[in-house]
């Protein structure tokens, strides 16, 4: 719970909640918002992973602006406990649905259960936490919800169908959400990053694990995708750029729905939109043949 002394300290601060704050975009965004004097409720599934965040916050003298809270967005018991925690808070200004991971493999060989797990975190987790905070924002007639999507929510890549489909779903849900809550003074925005140097790119290892069968008919295709991911490691963007963009959206008086960010992301979205599908398909498949 937020203790009485902490409540006094947060009285004149904007309060932000961010899921998946133990690393990557979540950790960096927590620190950047704290620098802007937000009181940040930094949630994570495993509290043992808070060490890096707390260490960096202490070095920057930001610990007074950060409250680490356990939250597994896929576990109803954890969500219920988080709801009890929220009962001690008088307002919520920003929600950043950042918790997520990427699963890969080829559709024929991926168990349906893997798709369910992917959606539980990347989509249903965001829905669950959003449902918790909406009554606060609606009552105060203000608030901002920032959903961390991906270029994979706009472009379907082979070998990544669980992740791609979960992000496409997040995009459609966010569009509906924005139209539903806009009349209550609540904004919804989607951030669509390209490839960045975060641990979400453990997907490369996941791909290898899912496709380790040397007799798989997709083995050669998988090897090419694996090579593409590995070759891209040297060109991954700086995740601080994404954290800064999230803060920019949080601070903006007005927001649009979608914010693509990253090398080549806007161009790729534009090209896919204007090209006939047959030409787009030809270019994508040809790019893999050249590997």
Put a short name on every predicted segment.
Residues 15, 22-24:
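Conserved glycine-rich cofactor-binding loop
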């Amino acid at each position: 719970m937020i203790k009485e002394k902490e409540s006094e300290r947060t009285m004149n601060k904007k309060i932000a909640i961010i899921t998946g704050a133990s690393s990557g975009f979540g950790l960096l965004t927590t620190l950047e918002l704290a620098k802007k004097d937000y009181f940040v409720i930094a949630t994570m599934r495993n509290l043992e992973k808070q060490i890096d965040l707390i260490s960096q916050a202490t070095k920057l003298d930001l610990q007074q602006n950060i409250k680490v809270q356990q939250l597994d967005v896929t576990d109803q018991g954890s969500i219920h406990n988080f709801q009890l925690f929220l009962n001690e808070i008088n307002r919520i200004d920003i929600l950043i649905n950042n918790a997520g991971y990427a699963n890969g493999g080829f559709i024929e060989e991926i168990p349906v259960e893997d798709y369910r797990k992917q959606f539980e975190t990347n989509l249903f987790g965001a829905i669950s936490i959003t449902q918790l905070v909406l009554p606060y924002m609606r009552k105060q007639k203000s608030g901002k919800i920032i959903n961390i999507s991906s270029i994979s929510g706009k472009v379907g890549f082979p070998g990544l169908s669980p992740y791609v489909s979960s992000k496409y779903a997040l995009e459609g849900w966010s569009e509906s959400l924005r139209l539903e809550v806009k009349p209550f003074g609540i904004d919804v925005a989607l951030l669509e990053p390209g490839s960045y140097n975060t641990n979400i790119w453990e997907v490369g290892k996941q791909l290898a694990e899912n496709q380790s069968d040397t007799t798989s008919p997709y083995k050669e295709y998988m090897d090419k995708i694996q090579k593409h991911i590995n070759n891209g490691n040297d060109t991954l963007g700086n995740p601080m750029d994404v954290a800064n963009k999230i803060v920019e959206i949080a601070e903006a008086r007005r927001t649009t729905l979608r914010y693509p960010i990253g090398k080549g992301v806007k161009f790729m979205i534009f090209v896919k939109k204007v090209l006939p599908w047959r030409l787009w398909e030809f270019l994508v498949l040809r790019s893999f043949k050249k590997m």
